[in-house]
From Swiss-Prot:
Major enzyme class: oxidoreductase
Protein's recorded name: L-aspartate dehydrogenase
EC number: 1.4.1.21
UniProt KW keywords: NAD, NADP, Oxidoreductase, Pyridine nucleotide biosynthesis
Family: Belongs to the L-aspartate dehydrogenase family.
GO molecular function, one term: oxidoreductase activity, acting on the CH-NH2 group of donors, NAD or NADP as acceptor
Coiled coil: none
Any Pfam family hit: NAD_binding_3
Note: The iminoaspartate product is unstable in aqueous solution and can decompose to oxaloacetate and ammonia.
Species this chain originates from: Burkholderia mallei (strain ATCC 23344)
Pathway: Cofactor biosynthesis; NAD(+) biosynthesis; iminoaspartate from L-aspartate (dehydrogenase route): step 1/1
Amino acid sequence: MRNAHAPVDVAMIGFGAIGAAVYRAVEHDAALRVAHVIVPEHQCDAVRGALGERVDVVSSVDALACRPQFALECAGHGALVDHVVPLLKAGTDCAVASIGALSDLALLDALSNAADAGGATLTLLSGAIGGIDALAAARQGGLDEVRYIGRKPPLGWLGTPAEAICDLRAMAAEQTIFEGSARDAAQLYPRNANVAATVALAGVGLDATRVCLIADPAVTRNVHRIVARGAFGEMSIEMSGKPLPDNPKTSALTAFSAIRALRNRASHCVI
């Protein structure tokens, strides 16, 4: 049992836009101590320079000075295999933001098996979308249908298969660029898959969740909509998310979700 007066010893995996925002938010929390940061080798010197000697900055789990009580992943899909799996096996509870990677069943099984072997808990963060608590609760009574509709400005789809479907730089009207399962959406649009995968894993699964992705010149933000029906009734939730002030490609709510996970871990009353 944790000493009620001792701060929770935390390892952060990744120190990009989300990681830096999370660190700044909890840096002075008395109940939390971000004592470790894991980043790729080529980033270690820069992160050490930013954080100073008070944080153990390393490039692997094996290099950690001691085992943390809790780990937060906000580094991208590769970090799940490289860092989260060994931490779970060692008994460290982990929260992860890179949910889109879990469309790979082998990876999801590896994480689940590692958590089981280490007696640890793996928490999937809700990230950029709300309503996940309601959807997961509704699943207990049975869900008949779950749909996710994601809209982005056309230029938000650059570098994706949408470029072969329409001219993203000269759109005058909205166009659907994908319709299918959440699993297929995650495989075709991996950089845009976290929300669809989160909705799917909370609800009816990656194959039964229907996804529609839209390039829409009328929107200036990323817009997420969940529609579900089942024994609980019906729900429809839509969110228009702002980005982090210093990174227009990163959802502010994703960072806030990670901050909440850390503070919940240190709290004795959680909602």
